Swiss-Prot record:
Keywords: Chloroplast, Manganese, Membrane, Photosynthesis, Photosystem II, Plastid, Thylakoid, Transit peptide
Organism encoding this protein: Fritillaria agrestis (Stinkbells)
Transit peptide start and end: 1-82
Chief location: plastid
Keyword Nucleus set for record: no
Name by which UniProt lists this protein: Oxygen-evolving enhancer protein 1, chloroplastic
Gene3D superfamilies named among the record's database cross-references: photosynthetic oxygen evolving center domain, Photosystem II, cytochrome c-550 precursor
Source lineage: Eukaryota, Viridiplantae, Streptophyta, Embryophyta, Tracheophyta
GO cellular component terms, A-Z: chloroplast thylakoid membrane; photosystem II oxygen evolving complex
Amino acid sequence: MASSLQAAATLIPAKVGAPARTHLRSNSHLSKAFGFDNSTAGRLTCSINSDLRDIAQKCTDAAKLAGFALATSALVISGASAEGVPKRLTFDEIQSKTYMEVKGSGTANQCPTIEGGTESFGYKTGKYTLKKLCLEPTSFTVKAEGINKNAPPEFQKTKLMTRLTYTLDEIEGPFEVAPDGTVKFEEKDGIDYAAVTVQLPGGERVPFLFTVKQLVATGKPESFSGSYLVPSYRGSSFLDPKGRGGSAGYDNAVALPAGGRGDEEELVKENIKDVSSSTGKITLSVTKSKPETGEVIGVFESIQPSDTDLGSKAPKDVKIQGIWYAQLE
């Protein structure tokens, strides 16, 4: 933008100067009519041209300053938007915002927080309905072999390769508080899965389906855990590049070797697609509650298998840590 302003400022004096030189140099009769001879008119022309050059230089300097100011403001704006995660808002604050205020801010991928409340589970014995359960991951680690040779497999930090669409939301189900203080939650409905891909330090990408389908968690509010269903990352109708699928496509796309020895197991993995589900485990902990508004927040940690590419690859363990928010009615 600064270059365009400078170009405009340079062109304007040039256009202004052109007719001035044309009129002053038109003919000697016009000079004599005003009482000037040719030499005086020439000096006058040079004087006007020098003034125009000064004006052009000032316009150029002003354009440079304007361009620098615009670039500085752009850097400030981009720096403000790149500072990191936005401020965490309460449920009411999020509901009060318009679509355009939320769009592109990162708020849609965040779980709400609680203002005030108590740092304990302050709900009495009884049966409730847990609604608007939100699970926001803050860390993805994958159990894999280290870069160093002979190093045992361990959970390694990863780089997120997908957009900020990994938060689960609007999950609901029955929630019960027993007389002995234990709680029980059963997941029934909601946006309970999200496809995520992360990258290991060595460059390997690990896709998985972050989910809590059919979760049944029991225990004390400080730590209640349970198992859940992890569906196949790909559906049975998905076709691989050779047209093979679980419920559609070719049965075999690679011919069996003569004699049927040596590669049977590898060929079976590629030809026969496995879309069976697996199991994950999650532990939730309550860190703060607000009974007057029915809100509760906490942290969670889950371990689940990654994608198997329809049975052709061994799954990796994925550890997901984050925060959660819910409302009890």
